[in-house]
Curated annotation (Swiss-Prot):
UniProt keyword list: Amino-acid biosynthesis, Metal-binding, Methionine biosynthesis, Methyltransferase, Repeat, Transferase, Zinc
Binding-site positions, Zn(2+): H657, C659, E681, C742
Required co-factors: Zn(2+)
Binding positions (L-methionine): I447, G448, S449, E500, D615
Lineage: Bacteria, Pseudomonadati, Pseudomonadota, Alphaproteobacteria, Hyphomicrobiales
Entries under NCBIfam families matching the protein: met_syn_B12ind (TIGR01371), PRK05222.1 (NF003556)
The protein's enzyme class: transferase
Name listed for the protein in its UniProt record: 5-methyltetrahydropteroyltriglutamate--homocysteine methyltransferase
Length: 769
């Protein structure tokens, strides 16, 4: 039997030691040249190609690398560059590219000046499907034209060829490219498809002439709910591309199953089809029945989005009968691009040997596919020892006392509906809370964090290195906390926060104190551009060995007679921003986290903290891609929040916070959370996001953000008061709190002081009528 090819759809592009991050920041900071940045990028690409080849991949991608974002790259390649950036044709300057990604304070970025002197804004950024990666949203005009403005896909194919590696270039497909973008006039981007497809055909022709016999063309939107018109767009686009010749196309779908889009995908004139068989393992037989026999099927059987070792023996049992009859029809691949996992476990030093044996990062996942290919295609005995090693590690994991905690399982089995309900309705709770807190109309507060200055970061680093004692660090943090409390009192904020100076990250801070979590030193993944994150790993049952925030909350409360909020990260966000164990349903893991937080909430209340905030910025991010699957998710997500928050007395006030999002499709769930107060980002939308709350007649209190914490601009008090008057249109003034859009951790103190003073003044104006 011939060897079944091993393909990768994309790999992490940040480098083994985050070289891309540091190269970008040096360039943006004026510390290196364009040539030095491009040389660093070329080195990462070369290392990635070599790593994949050494790990056993026979089909290696090119053009999966990007300096910032692959969707932005596609927009630039196709000439979809908004007029504001000043591109007039020819080669696209690197600074124009970065202005689209990050905005620019420089007038030269767009070739003309602006009335406000603030340069040009970045394109909008949003989540890539249901992952924690962010992409830049392409913008189109109604009369948008496209042209081949960059030959990056061809150049990187040639670059790999010079290295002796024949690659399969990767392109984001035309229909997904348009669907992921937006038209400035609010029209349907798919109307632009007839103008776009010829440019794709031109690019594919150039790749063919360069020697690319196959091209991977990603159409992840095929796993979404589509209208018949949208399905027709796929047919139109790929019929047109097929008519022009060009290389063979491997149409890649991922993040779910084709579902009711299968007939459309099966009928497209493409040579290959990639399937996500991790998210949707049951679709394979239907695809094999529907697709032409000559269609190559890429089997996405290794999880490209999580870091757990694959059960190779189980996969062999499952795939053996399928590939046996026609091995030449199949390729083996990860479920999606490996962008979403760290690059290489071999450089990781932060996890113990046992836990390490349960993990697989990008390189190891390619190695797993190579083992699978050998076992399916050749003599299994040649790799049997490696298969056995994986099976032993999985068996140890399944039976480990580190993973399974009977006490946690017992608590979950004893859950009752009453545990997820407050003892009194909101109307009664509000009266009791007002008696306790005695707050004015339009009460003011902040979302939680205050600026993490260089001094705070230096003290944390010094403590971590042993250069500053724990006692010294604790004293420093207490000093910062007291300054924050005193300053909030001086300007007249009503419900205070302690500032969170002791916290490095809103998820990491808590997960470091919970059982069942582990942390890496080199497990970096790209969030966007140069921003990299190290998601914690949930490997076992989650519990809280001891209180996590009570000492800091009670210290801050001891400094003032005003209420100080206890600050927690909610269970859904703790789940969404972690690598989650794959041996339990996600909702079960979330309930475990909810119980740990429930204990913390109870301890805060017992310690005299009367206002407790449980942030859930990731609640909407967890929504399944398919509409039919969303109600079940929202049911357990809301239940977990309520499990965490409902064990308190009615006079204890529960707050939550959600970041910038569309709320229309989840407003029922937000109301069902039954938080006494919700704060949301609304300033950038000029309170437009409140429409959903007005239409729903949202019953509880709400704090619409009155200034954008992402901007250094400090709006005057009158402007904030105007926003609050807009909020009054449709909301009862008694419902309205006054707060910023989000936490202030990344801002400078000079900005924060003026902004919050103006915010307090705006609230005073509202009280005065």
């Amino acid at each position: 039997m011939s060897q079944i090819p091993v393909a990768t759809l994309g790999v992490p592009r940040i480098g083994r030691r985050r070289e891309l991050k540091f190269a970008l920041e040096a360039y943006w900071g004026g510390e290196s040249s364009e040539g030095e940045l491009l040389a660093a990028a070329a080195k990462i690409r070369a290392e990635n190609w070599s790593l994949q080849k050494a790990a056993g991949a026979s089909i290696i991608p090119s053009n999966d690398f990007t300096l910032y974002d692959h969707v932005l790259d596609m927009a630039v390649t196709l000439g979809a560059i908004p007029e504001i950036y000043g591109w007039a044709g020819g080669a696209v300057p690197l600074d124009t590219y970065f202005a689209m990604a990050r905005g620019s304070q420089e007038r030269e970025a767009c070739g003309h000046s602006h009335h406000d002197g603030t340069g040009v804004p970045a394109l909008e950024m949003t989540k890539w499907f249901d992952t924690n990666y962010h992409y830049m949203v392409p913008e189109f005009d109604a009369d948008q034209t496209f042209r081949l403005a960059s030959l990056k896909p061809v150049e990187e194919f040639d670059e790999a060829k010079r290295q002796g590696i024949h690659t399969r270039p990767v392109l984001l497909g035309p229909v997904s490219f348009l669907k992921l973008g937006k038209r400035r006039d609010g029209g349907d981007p798919l109307e632009l498809l007839p103008r776009l497809v010829p440019v794709y055909a031109e690019l594919l022709g150039k790749l063919l002439r360069a020697g690319a016999d196959w091209v991977q063309i990603d159409e992840p939107c095929l796993v979404l709910d589509l209208t018949e018109r949208e399905r027709r767009a796929f047919t139109i686009a790929y019929d047109a591309l097929a008519a022009t010749g060009g290389p063979k196309l491997m149409l890649a779908t991922y993040f779910g199953g084709l579902g009711d889009n299968l007939p459309t995908a099966a009928a497209l004139p493409v040579a290959g089809l990639h399937l996500d068989l991790v998210r949707a393992p049951d679709q394979l037989q239907d695809v094999l029945s529907a697709a032409p026999e000559e269609r190559v099927i890429s089997l996405g059987v290794v999880d490209g989005r999580n870091i757990w070792r694959t059960d190779i023996a189980a996969l062999l049992d499952r795939l053996g009968p399928i590939v046996k009859g026609n091995p030449g029809r199949f390729q083996l691949a990860p479920s999606c691009s490996l962008l979403h996992v760290p690059l290489d476990l071999s450089i990781e030093t932060g996890v113990d040997p046992e836990l390490r044996s349960w993990l697989a990062f990008a390189v190891q996942k390619v190695e797993e596919l190579s083992i699978l290919s050998h076992a399916l295609s050749a003599d299994r005995s040649l790799v049997q020892s490696l298969i056995d090693m994986a099976s032993r590690a999985l068996a140890v994991r399944a039976s480990s006392t580190r993973v399974n905690d009977p006490h946690v399982a017992g608590r979950l089995s004893a859950v009752t509906p009453e545990m997820a309900k407050r003892s009194e309705p909101f109307s009664e709770r509000r009266k009791l809370q007002q008696e306790r807190l005695n707050l004015p109309a339009f009460p003011t507060t902040t979302i939680g964090s205050f600026p993490q200055t260089a001094e705070v970061r230096q003290a944390r680093a010094a403590c971590a290195k042993g250069e500053l004692s724990e006692a010294g660090y604790d004293g420093f943090l207490k000093g910062e906390t007291e300054k924050a409390i005193r300053w909030q009192e001086e300007i007249g904020i009503d419900v205070l926060v302690h500032g969170e100076f002791e916290r490095n990250d809103m998820v990491q801070y808590f997960s470091e104190q919970l059982s069942g979590y582990a942390f890496t030193k080199q497990g970096w993944v790209q969030s966007y551009g140069s921003r990299c994150v190290r998601p914690p790993i949930i490997f076992g049952d989650v519990s809280r060995p001891q209180p996590m925030t009570v000492d800091w909350a009670t210290y801050a409360q001891s400094l003032t007679d005003k209420p100080v909020k206890g600050m927690l990260t909610g269970p859904v966000t703790m789940l969404q921003w972690s690598f989650v164990r794959d041996d339990l349903p996600r909702e079960t893991v979330c309930r475990q986290i909810a119980f740990a937080l429930r204990d913390e909430v109870s301890d805060l209340e017992a310690a005299g903290i009367g206002v407790i905030q449980i942030d859930e910025p990731a609640l909407r991010e967890g929504l399944p891609l398919r509409e039919a699957e969303r109600p079940a998710y929202l049911d357990w997500a809301v239940e977990c929040f309520r499990l965490a928050s409902s064990g308190v007395k009615p006079e204890t006030q529960i707050h939550t916070h959600m970041c910038y999002a569309e709320f229309n499709d989840i407003i029922d769930a937000i109301a069902a959370m039954d938080a006494d107060v919700i704060s949301i980002e609304t300033s950038r939308s000029k309170m437009e996001l409140l429409r959903a709350f007005r239409a729903f007649r949202y019953p509880n209190d709400i704090g619409p953000g009155v200034f954008d914490i992402h901007s250094p601009r400090v709006p005057p008090a009158d402007e904030m008061a105007d926003l609050l008057r807009k909020a009054e249109d449709g909301l009862d003034p008694r419902q309205i709190w006054v707060n910023p859009d989000c936490g202030l951790k990344t801002r400078k103190w000079e900005e924060v002081r003026f902004a919050l003073a103006n915010m307090v003044e705006a609230a005073r104006q509202m009280r005065a009528g």
